[in-house]
Amino acid sequence: MKKLITCGAAVLAVFCACDKNIEPEPAPLAPPAEVWLSASSGTSLTFSWTEVEDAVRYALRLDRSDDGSNVSQTSVTGTSHTFSGLETGTEYVFKVRAVASDDKLSSSYSEEYKAVPGSSTPDPDPEPDDPDDDPDIPDGAYEQFRISPDEDAHGLALAFPGAEGGGMYTTGGRGGRVIHVTNLNDSGEGSLRAAINESGPRIVVFDVAGIIELESKLRIRNGDLTIAGQTAPGDGICIKNYATVVEADNVIIRFMRFRLGDQGSNADDGEDAIWGRRQRDIIIDHCSMSWSIDECASFYGNSNFTMQWCIMTESLRRSVHDKGEHGYGGIWGGENASFHHNLLANHDSRNPRFDHPEIYENPSDPDMRGNVDYRNNAVYNWGSNSSYGGEGGHFNMVNNYYRQGPASRDREYFLDANGIYTSSGTDYGYPYLYMSGNYYLQYPDMTAEDGVYWHDHHTNTPPDPTRLLSALLPISGPDGQTVYTTTHSAQAAFDRICEVGGASLVRDEVDERACHDAETGTATFTDGGNGSTGGIIDTPSAVGGWPEYSADTGNEANDKTDSDGDGMPDWFEERFGLDPDSASDASGMTLDRHGRYSNLEMYLHWLVRDVMASGTEGGSYAALD
């Protein structure tokens, strides 16, 4: 038999030698070699599979096991997908095939995988593409990125390693162009505004450090955007003079400073430092906001939103707002919205103000208003009021830290809960509240029941303790995915925020002052400049004005040599066995052994790996369901 095959092969070889133009028939793709369950909740299943070379996408099919009826057929370009809205306790059957550019060469379906939402336990990742097995990548490379073991356990692709809460699945500019900011101009080629005004998926990186003095509002109107402030050299980037407004879906903003001030023509219209409403899929991470004329950072009416690890301080009280005294922290709310590990310091009020129905276009049926998770935030040195509002809303208040400062009125509560919106007199009912683990330094024994002031606005509306809930209000992803967050005790969260909150890759003196004052219970500056005292300020000049932001301060992002222009500097590519002369490896996934993040995304994480790891240290990572 072996001889016959050999002879046949010889004849074939002679035939081919006579006609070299005959191409061998291409082989069809193989199906994914392995399929596994990477996450499961009561109503969702997340499946992952191994990558197939030359596949342009993957066709997925999910059927019920009991009757074989089809539940979903879809296609994706990645190697993971979540099916939502499933029935708890029902068994489903999943399979996937690799699709080629020529569909005739697409693979057959993989072996079937059966799973039950709420019962099946996710599998350990088989790690088929461990970068440590790649001879070009140094041993132990993946461990150097310090990605949380909890995130590795569920294996989900997040906005970035360390993204948590309602906006954790935001994709931003993933897979898009890299746009370099090369100057500090307000507009024009190489400016931040020009990069933001582009369309399509894009990741904005910075080759410069310093202050961008805006000449008009910076409006983000085109989504699918990642602004990676951590890529700036030295002291980083600060935005001045006008508000930044998020008016698009699918936006990631990280390690930026928004220090508005009272200069220029913005001074009479009640500007916030940064704000956004009525958008979807947004995450604001490790940013610093100050010197607003109205609120420092207001985000409400957004769906699947997260603001995490931010510092908001020193809004301007007796400034140039046309309504007179202001100086507020922010208005916070939305639907599946998370606000965690943030510091609100030195604001007269709105620390925060939880949203109310009349903020929305239809108060009787407000779109994008739902459950809000407010946890592990720290509030220090309010003036007239701390946290209040929430008419008719739904809020978790978990493990937050409150501390009076030199300017603080004695507010003996965690929340001043409103039922009546005073401007219209409409009674929307008190908010529904799940309260647990909150801590007030001056009143350490305060309980959840004691910590709510039911504000009746002189209408004799009685307190409504039935609005205090016994179970957590769930937060879910845009397609019903399970949402996770890290929770510390209130005191530990305060310590973590002061350690790594804000644009802390290189922290400036404004954030240093905010954290020092909050930790010591003091006010570095007692004269606010126009009559305010005790750390509440009226003008930036009262605290020394804007710091200088040098490009020369020690920072791992300082060496900007990037021969192939792919957003990853040569030193990083050389360190991890990539090719500094080939831009194609930016989109590869050789550095993430779990196949979630591109090499470019891993570089963006590399710059802040220690900040992200330090923040979650000592916390408990769990689903918000």
Describe these PLM feature segments.
Residues 52-73:
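Extracellular low-complexity, O-glycosylation-prone stalks/linkers
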Residues 158-204:
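Acidic Gly/Asp/Thr-rich repetitive segments characteristic of extracellular carbohydrate-active
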Residues 83-102:
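Beta-strand-rich modules
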Residues 544-625:
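Extracellular calcium-associated, cysteine-rich motifs in secreted modular proteins
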